[in-house]
């Protein structure tokens, strides 16, 4: 369960849009507002700062339990996550300690926050670094690689959401004595409950190790 401020980009999950909200104010007050406001956002010719923020009239989305399903996109494969070369141009062996870094798309620790949910899809980039000591013969090089087993999945999620709060509208001339009016979300939206859906490209990387290759002459 979570609670966050509603945004205009969330309205599609409620079968609504900024035009839906503007039309509701037009029906209620008999004239079309210049702009509308939702929390810290405005739309059309809105008053700045948005009146919902200025007058403390928030609108929230309450999220329920997330339903998650996954689909395998590929069988587990050995992948090289990163590599570095230790080079010795001298005439005697040297021992080097250096880091090898692997950068890969990994969803193993992704967080299904509301901000990720509303975007529809996401992937998470992770970086792994390991240090290794390598002895390199004279006039040779040794390649050190970070390898791991990668399994790619597509994760589908659905999050029920309900909405409660206010929208605002500003008018170019006074309406019933005021330039600003507020309406409850129930009067502005086609519905105040829905399901946010999306996908996340998800790659599990496991059994990460560092491999030192054979020395090669320069």
Swiss-Prot record:
Physiological role: Does not induce flaccid paralysis when injected into blowfly larvae and lacks hemolytic activity.
Subcellular location: Secreted
A GO cellular component entry from the record: extracellular region
Organism: Hydra viridissima
Keywords from the named record: Secreted, Toxin
Gene Ontology molecular function terms on file: toxin activity
UniProt protein name: Hydralysin-3
Family classification: Belongs to the hydralysin family.
Gene: Hln-3
Gene3D superfamilies: 3.10.290.50
Keyword Secreted found: yes
Main location, first listed in the record: secreted
UniProt superkingdom: Eukaryota
Highest classification ranks of the organism: Eukaryota, Metazoa, Cnidaria, Hydrozoa, Hydroidolina
């Amino acid at each position: 369960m979570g609670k966050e401020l509603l945004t205009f980009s969330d309205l599609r999950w409620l079968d609504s849009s900024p035009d839906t909200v503007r039309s509701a104010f037009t029906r209620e007050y008999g004239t079309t507002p210049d702009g509308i406001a939702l929390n810290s956002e405005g739309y059309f010719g809105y008053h700045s700062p948005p009146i919902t923020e200025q007058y403390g009239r928030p609108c929230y989305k309450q999220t329920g339990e997330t339903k998650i399903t996954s689909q395998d996109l590929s069988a587990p494969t050995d992948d090289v996550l990163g590599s570095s070369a230790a080079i010795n141009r001298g005439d005697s062996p040297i021992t080097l300690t250096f880091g090898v870094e692997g950068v890969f798309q990994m969803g193993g620790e992704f967080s299904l926050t509301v901000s990720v949910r509303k975007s529809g899809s996401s992937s998470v980039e992770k970086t792994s670094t390991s240090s290794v000591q390598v002895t390199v013969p004279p006039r040779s090089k040794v390649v050190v690689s970070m390898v791991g087993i990668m399994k790619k999945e597509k994760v589908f999620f659905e999050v029920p959401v309900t909405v409660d709060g206010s929208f605002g509208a500003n008018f170019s001339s006074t309406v019933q004595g005021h330039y600003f009016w507020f309406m409850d979300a129930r009067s502005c939206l086609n519905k105040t409950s829905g399901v946010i859906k999306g996908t996340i490209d998800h790659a599990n990387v496991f059994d990460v190790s560092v491999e030192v290759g054979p020395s090669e002459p320069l």
